[in-house]
C-alpha cells in the first residue's frame, strides 16, 4: 500500500468518505485519490513524491499556476498585518473597483466566501427585487450546493424540479424549473406560459460541470430577450468562467450584459472567496441599503482579497489570454489528433483556459449528449494518464484547466502520454 492509499484509509476514519468534496474521492473513476503535499507552477507532487502535470488547477482558480511568487508575496504581506478583522478594509474597495472595471455589467459588487454563497445570495436578491418566487436553471449546470439549486428536472415541461440530494425538502425546490441547456424552443414556451412568475434565470455561460458545453448564440440571445421582456433577472454564474475564459468573463464573449453575475475561483487567486454583483438598482436592495439580507463573518477577508487582487492585476498583462487560449487549443488539438491516430471516437473543445474532452465522435451540446459519451473508456484513459504523470479531472463530466505556467513542453508531454494511453485502451 503506497502513501496515498494509507492516507486515504486514515482519512476515512475521521472525514466522511475520506474527502472534503465528493469528486476528490475518485468515486467515478475508481482507485485511491492522490493526496497532494505541494505544488509549483504547472505541477503537483503527491504523497509518494510523484510529480504530476496538473490540469485541474484546484478546479479553476490557479490560472497563473500554483504558488505564483507575486500572489504568495501578497498573501504573506497581508497575513503579517492580521488574518481577519470583521471590519471594512481599503483592500476590499480595491478589488471591488477592479471587478467593476473588468466587467462593465457589474456596477456594484458584494464579496462573500464561496461560489455557493454567491449564487445563493444572487437568487435571494433576484427574488427580493422582483417579488417573485420561480427560478429557472438548466440541466447539467451546477451552481453550488444550496438547497434550491440541488434540483433535477421534473417529469415534463412546466413541471417544477425534484431534489437531487437527500436532505433537501421538496418545498425548497418546488419553485425551481429545470430546462434543457441550448433548447431555445423550450425556453420560449416556458416564458410564454409562466413568464410573469419567473424571478430569475441562472446560467453557466460556458457549462463546466457536465464537461465543457458551449451555449449557442441563439440560446444566450433568447435568454437576454425573454428575461427583459418579462421583467426577470438574468444571472450569469461565472464562478468558473469569470476571468478564466476571457478577461471580461464569458459575458464579454457573448456580447451579453446580464443583470447579475456571480464570481469565485480565479477572483480569489486560490484563496476562499466569492462575489456577486450587477446592476446598481438591483444591488441596492441588499442590506444595509435594502430589505434583502446577506452577511458573512469572513466576507472580504484581507488575505483572500490580497491574493485575488494580485491575480487580477497579473492577468491584465498584454497578450495573457491570447497565449492561454493558444496553449489550451494546442493541448486539445493534440489529444484529438492522437485519438484519431488510434481510431478512437473522441472530440475536444476549449474556451480560453477551459477545455473539455469527450469519448464521443462529436462535441456535445447538451447534458443528454455528454452523458451518452463512453464513460468506461474515459475511466481507463484517466488512469493511464495518471500513471504517466498527468492529472486530469477524475470524472468524465468535469472541465479541465490550463494555466499560464504550462509550457509547450508540458503540452507536448501530455499529448505523448495521451497517444500511449489511447493505444492501451
From Swiss-Prot:
Catalytic reaction(s) noted: (S)-4-amino-5-oxopentanoate = 5-aminolevulinate
Protein name: Glutamate-1-semialdehyde 2,1-aminomutase
Pathway(s) of this molecule: Porphyrin-containing compound metabolism; protoporphyrin-IX biosynthesis; 5-aminolevulinate from L-glutamyl-tRNA(Glu): step 2/2
CDD domains, A to Z: OAT_like
Cofactor(s) demanded: pyridoxal 5'-phosphate
Entries under HAMAP family matching the protein: HemL_aminotrans_3
Ranges that cross the membrane: none
GO biological process: protoporphyrinogen IX biosynthetic process
Native species: Laribacter hongkongensis (strain HLHK9)
Keywords: Cytoplasm, Isomerase, Porphyrin biosynthesis, Pyridoxal phosphate
Subcellular location: Cytoplasm
Gene that encodes it: hemL
GO cellular component, one term: cytoplasm
GO molecular function: glutamate-1-semialdehyde 2,1-aminomutase activity; pyridoxal phosphate binding; transaminase activity
InterPro entries reported for this sequence: 4pyrrol_synth_GluAld_NH2Trfase, Aminotrans_3, Aminotrans_3_PPA_site, PyrdxlP-dep_Trfase, PyrdxlP-dep_Trfase_major, PyrdxlP-dep_Trfase_small
NCBIfam families: hemL, PRK00062.1
Family per similarity comment: Belongs to the class-III pyridoxal-phosphate-dependent aminotransferase family. HemL subfamily.
Chief place of localization: cytoplasm
A Pfam family annotated for this UniProt entry: Aminotran_3
Amino acid at each position: 500500500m503506497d502513501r496515498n492509499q494509507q492516507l486515504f484509509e486514515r482519512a476515512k476514519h475521521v472525514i466522511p468518505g475520506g474527502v472534503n468534496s465528493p469528486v476528490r474521492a475518485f468515486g467515478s473513476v475508481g482507485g485511491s485519490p492522490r493526496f497532494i503535499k505541494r505544488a509549483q507552477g504547472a505541477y503537483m507532487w503527491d504523497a509518494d513524491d510523484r510529480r504530476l502535470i496538473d490540469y485541474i488547477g484546484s478546479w479553476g482558480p490557479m490560472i497563473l499556476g500554483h504558488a505564483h511568487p507575486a500572489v504568495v508575496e501578497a498573501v504573506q504581506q497581508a497575513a503579517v498585518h492580521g488574518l481577519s478583522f470583521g471590519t471594512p478594509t481599503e483592500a476590499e474597495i480595491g478589488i471591488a473597483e477592479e471587478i467593476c472595471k473588468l466587467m462593465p455589467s457589474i456596477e456594484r459588487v458584494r464579496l462573500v466566501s464561496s461560489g455557493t454563497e454567491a449564487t445563493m445570495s444572487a437568487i435571494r436578491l433576484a427574488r427580493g427585487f422582483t417579488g417573485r418566487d420561480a427560478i429557472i436553471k438548466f440541466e447539467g449546470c451546477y451552481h453550488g450546493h444550496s438547497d434550491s439549486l440541488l434540483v433535477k428536472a421534473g417529469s415534463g415541461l412546466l413541471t417544477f424540479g425534484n431534489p437531487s440530494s437527500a436532505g433537501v425538502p421538496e418545498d425548497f425546490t418546488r419553485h425551481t424549473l429545470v430546462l434543457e441547456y441550448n433548447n431555445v424552443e423550450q425556453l420560449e414556451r416556458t416564458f410564454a406560459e409562466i413568464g410573469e412568475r419567473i424571478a430569475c434565470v441562472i446560467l453557466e455561460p460556458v457549462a463546466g460541470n457536465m464537461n465543457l458545453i458551449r451555449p449557442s448564440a441563439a440560446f444566450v440571445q433568447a435568454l437576454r430577450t425573454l428575461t427583459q421582456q418579462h421583467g426577470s433577472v438574468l444571472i450569469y454564474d461565472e464562478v468558473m468562467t469569470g476571468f478564466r475564459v476571457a478577461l471580461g468573463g464569458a459575458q464579454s464573449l457573448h456580447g451579453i450584459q446580464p443583470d447579475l453575475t456571480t464570481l469565485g475561483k480565479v477572483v480569489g487567486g486560490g484563496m476562499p472567496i466569492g462575489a456577486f454583483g450587477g446592476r446598481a438598482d438591483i444591488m441596492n436592495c441588499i442590506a444595509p441599503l435594502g430589505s434583502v439580507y446577506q452577511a458573512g463573518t469572513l466576507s472580504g477577508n484581507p488575505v483572500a482579497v490580497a491574493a485575488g487582487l494580485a491575480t487580477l492585476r497579473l492577468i491584465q498583462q498584454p497578450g495573457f489570454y491570447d497565449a492561454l487560449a493558444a496553449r489550451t487549443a494546442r493541448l486539445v488539438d493534440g489529444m484529438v489528433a492522437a485519438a484519431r491516430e488510434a481510431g478512437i471516437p473522441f472530440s475536444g473543445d476549449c474556451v480560453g483556459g477551459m477545455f473539455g474532452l469527450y469519448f464521443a465522435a462529436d462535441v456535445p451540446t447538451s447534458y443528454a449528449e455528454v452523458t451518452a459519451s463512453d464513460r468506461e473508456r474515459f475511466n481507463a484513459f484517466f488512469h493511464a494518464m495518471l500513471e504517466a504523470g498527468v492529472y486530469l479531472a477524475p470524472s468524465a463530466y468535469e472541465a479541465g484547466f490550463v494555466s499560464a505556467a504550462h509550457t509547450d513542453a508540458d503540452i507536448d508531454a501530455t499529448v505523448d502520454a495521451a497517444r500511449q494511453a489511447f493505444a492501451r485502451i
